[in-house]
Design a protein with these regions (language model features):
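The feature represents the first ordered module of a protein
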Residues: 1-65
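Short, compact, well-ordered microdomains
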Residues: 71-98
Length: 98
């Protein structure tokens, strides 16, 4: 029987201003070439219309990266805890520009 990914965290918060904060992290059964750290993740802070303000993800074919509005930057994933800290810090640090 093939091992399945295990949900590490799945959290969504609908903010009073209508923005959405979502954190989803999966622990993969085994590391892969694209995800050598063994995690698949999506951390997203967006407007109600879906416009991305801050997003961290490792979508297939792109590897670890982050988005601040429409700009994309490389990201070095270390741990699930650290990616959450980095995500929250980017929201706070870019607050006036988002």
């Amino acid at each position: 029987m093939r091992e399945r990914a295990k949900l590490y965290i799945d959290k969504r918060v609908d903010q009073s201003d209508g923005s959405i904060l979502e954190i989803v992290i999966w622990k993969l059964p085994n590391p892969t070439a694209e995800r050598p750290h063994g995690y698949k993740y999506r951390l997203n802070y967006s407007l109600p219309d879906g416009t991305t303000l801050v997003r961290y993800d490792n979508e297939t074919g792109k590897g670890d990266h982050l988005h601040i509005r429409a700009k994309e930057y490389p990201y070095t994933f270390t741990t699930p805890e650290q990616v959450i800290i980095d995500f929250i810090n980017d929201i706070k640090n870019n607050e006036g520009q988002l």
